[in-house]
Amino acid sequence: MSERCRCKYSSGASIDYMPTSTQAKMVSKRIAQETFDAAVRENIEEFAMGPDEAVKEAVEQFESQGVDLSNIVKTAPKVSADGSQEPTHDILQTLSDLQESVASSRPQEVSAYLTRFCDQCKQDKACRFLAAQKGAYPIIFTAWKLATAGDQGLLLQSLNALSVLTDGQPDLLDTQGLQLLVATLTRNADEADLTCSGIRCVRHACLKHEQNRQDLVKAGVLPLLTGAITHHGHHADVVREACCALRVMTFDDDIRVPFGHAHNHAKMIVQENKGLKVLIEATKAFLDNPGILSELCGTLSRLAIRNEFCQEVVDLGGLSILVSLLADCNDHQMGDQSSVQELVKQVLSILRAIAGNDDVKDAIVRAGGTESIVAAMTQHLTSPQVCEQSCAALCFLALRKPDNSRIIVEGGGAVAALQAMKAHPQKAGVQKQACMLIRNLVAHSQAFSKPILDLGAEALIMQARSAHRDCEDVAKAALRDLGCHVELRELWTGQRGNLAP
């Protein structure tokens, strides 16, 4: 790029500074879409570049200045067919056409423009961002209200457009939209496609937005979500979306609020809406679909937050289903390798969650859970996620349970854990959970120390301790309980300040 072009960018671009979520001291530079478009237009008009070259030069120049262009539409604005309008981006032209057709109450045109709007927004998140900046939400909301008069096809397209627009932009949903969303789901509970799209809107509106979560829960969305799983129990897309939405309701991911209602929402799903029963029953319709089973198991693990909820999973027959699923995965009876590994990880996650109840620990062992967990870790040794979850589940089963520790060791659990440590030396999660498992196995059963040490445990634990800072405490605890020499340091001695006697 010429020196002249560089000077124009550096003098003409209005750059804002926005803090990122990950680096407190670093800042991310951002520009407006108009600034980028002006730079592209200058390249075309003053330097005789073609549209593609002009965009490429603008991108390179702004990025060289550290500008974040993730929310910028990186195409040259187009001139309208008749040349009567200023050049604009496709998404803004579609938005303008949609607004005109909505204002004129022409449903067929509205439908066509909504479809085009969805297609364009799906191609690039920058299109969604630009559309939102230019007033897309009130236009879609008006189309949505127009569709509620009874046009099911237009209603579905309106919900699809809303779900695409709110993906990553949950602040767009206002009080009116929230109320209309709940009303739409209530009135169309029998329609699978409408229910699926509406629930997707709920999920997008609630992700990283605590206020929307609380407002939707108060408006009665939880029974609509569990009811959708019950009513459309054989419709995979509805079940998947409903599970995702239920999980989002239990998240505490909004950094703008000091604390959320995740725990209360999980309790409400279980106690007021029979969430555990609904999810466990739903698994029976998808025993040959590892993708949906993963969603169901992942949601169950988010709800097993209390001692009695863990026991309820067992009482409802959930434990036998989980152990059977794990055995089927180990026997290669379902799906491709990646989907099977994801299902195994989710089954292990829920087993780990419900093993927080001491009575459930024993029930899992009696049901053959330890053998299935060890087999899963051995079968999927190349997956660090499966190894980590396997060690974590066995760790919970061994906690305060010497008899369970014996069964785990005799079943090859210690061997499998050490193999996992060898296979994934750089994975802190695997190393940490394996150290915790070994510690729990020998904490109340010193007889297992020598056999485990003979397998090379000390060297592996020392390696984990030196490689991963997070493993320091658990590694020392494991070495101590194995009978190895560990140098313990006093972090606070009370020798200085007011703590001294």
Curated annotation (Swiss-Prot):
| ARM repeats mapped onto the chain | 220-264, 274-318, 319-369, 370-412
GO biological process annotations for this chain's record? hematopoietic progenitor cell differentiation
- What keywords appear on the UniProt entry? Methylation, Phosphoprotein, Repeat
Membrane-spanning regions, if any?
Answer: none
Q: Which PROSITE patterns match?
A: ARM_REPEAT
List, alphabetically, the InterPro entries matched. ARM-like, ARM-type_fold, Armadillo
Q: Which residues carry this modification: Phosphoserine?
A: 64
Q: In the record, which positions carry Pros-methylhistidine?
A: 263
Coiled-coil regions listed in the entry: none
Q: Which domain of life is it from?
A: Eukaryota
Q: In what way is this protein post-translationally modified?
A: Methylated at His-263 by METTL9.
Q: What's the family?
A: Belongs to the ARMC6 family.
Q: What is this protein called?
A: Armadillo repeat-containing protein 6
Species of the source: Pongo abelii
Lineage here is:
Eukaryota, Metazoa, Chordata, Craniata, Vertebrata
